[in-house]
């Protein structure tokens, strides 16, 4: 039942029932008065489908209507915050939230059961009877969007918020300041937008070290920001703003040069026109801290979020190391080096945010020189930094670049660039299947550390996303995989089932005109003729053992550790050979002459499946020879340990 329904995230518990419910223009919504905002959103969606006004009745759920959707609350439900129960029966749909956010999550599940295209071709739709009990695994289910490198209209951001809600994501991390542009209006410092919001040029697609010579920029007014915050809040999404400091600050320093390190040689700040990391960082002056506190005061007034993100990443120390004043601060404060100066800088900001009853979030570089005790660390680099924060008792949000950076290519780079320079990405490779396979809790060693992992977040860095269509292409459908790993516990995940459901959800994307990518499906993990293959070795990434005997030139098995004596790969044929055959096994990668090839091993065969006879020794990573009719199995046996891992391209029998 679950596999046939386009539900992403998959509900934790879904049970099929007898019968169905017919939703039509005659269906009314009966709701608890605390759910009036959520009811209005649902009613609007149904009206778009039916083409007629939806009747909504706030009668505290006392009188059941003949055809209805009932929205209720029950804090006693044995579910996590944000959980809900949903029943579809012949007389109607009932959604009961543990809290208001849970009721809204249930509404999103209902909307995914409705037709994608609006208005409906028919005047009604039949929904299968079912029972759902559902709750989120993580409280932080986030998407990040960089509006510093490129600026996007507020109406597009609202559509993005809608899609986040549809996927039950609940944190929008809004990256608002960068070396290449300052995007948030600050009343006290108007030059931040008059100067900092505009750059003189932008690298064109296909030439990262060139300029298009076109002035570029834009910013969000405080009124626009208030509107977006309210829009997101109505959809149970918290907007966490990011104001970068002490680095990625060139645009701000270009607007107000006095807050940079003015005593260094060649000081000449400007809004940057190239991507990458730039040296301009805020000076550790008292005037700078007052400047930043003034900015953050206005930010806190605009954003009710408990969390304020201060960046903290990729802050070069070269200017501090050149600055006489910065060195004097280090000496005065007893700081050993510029790393500790960054920690001092972050702690000053943390203390200020605490005075505003806000909590600091920063990228994992904020631990350099010492991690503030109450800070939440957003992990994007090596997972060892997550372990470091967990050891110290800090909370973390997992946002690893290898698994959650949606600015990476999602299909082979050659294939993408063959379609045009506008398909350029920063690099990397993150297909849907790889993102789906990520477990945010993999770094936790015990339940205490698991609770310190607040959740997971996908990142959209936009150097190579000049317009909204490109943002959509990079975000969809990978956002669906992100949503499921943020909502479901690991033991409930199943990629094959997810992939079936994704086809249904992509119909919603298409109906809305979203410029989605075509997901890259991994090769099926099966042998070419139904033979059984097994190994004593771990598997690296998605390079399954079946790929050693699948008949495809573009797949291979890759072991995930060093080899030990008596490690093996054993192929048990579907049926015995009927004639003499020649067997060849080729190992080794292309990275180097000796890369991941078998140095010491034997190729063996068996007629009875248990007695093994040597065919040949491996030499330069290859073994071949003839085996007799009636052979039932082949084996690659490691005869000596080796530090290289092992790649097996294909076991051929001819």
Q: Which residues make up each language-model segment?
A:
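Flexible, acidic glycine-rich loops studded with aromatic residues
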Residues: 359-375, 381-528
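Contiguous, structured surface segment used for ligand recognition
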Residues: 3-140, 470, 485-519
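Exposed aromatic-hydrophobic patches
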Residues: 571, 622-628
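Feature activates predominantly on carbohydrate-active enzymes
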Residues: 75-307, 348, 352, 452, ...
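Active-site neighborhood of glycoside hydrolase catalytic domains
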Residues: 257, 271-273, 277-373, 380-388
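Short beta-strand-plus-loop segments that form exposed binding edges in beta-rich domains
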Residues: 636-644
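Disordered, acidic Ser/Thr/Pro-rich linker "stalks" and the adjacent N-terminal cap
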Residues: 520-579, 586-601, 617-618, 650-654
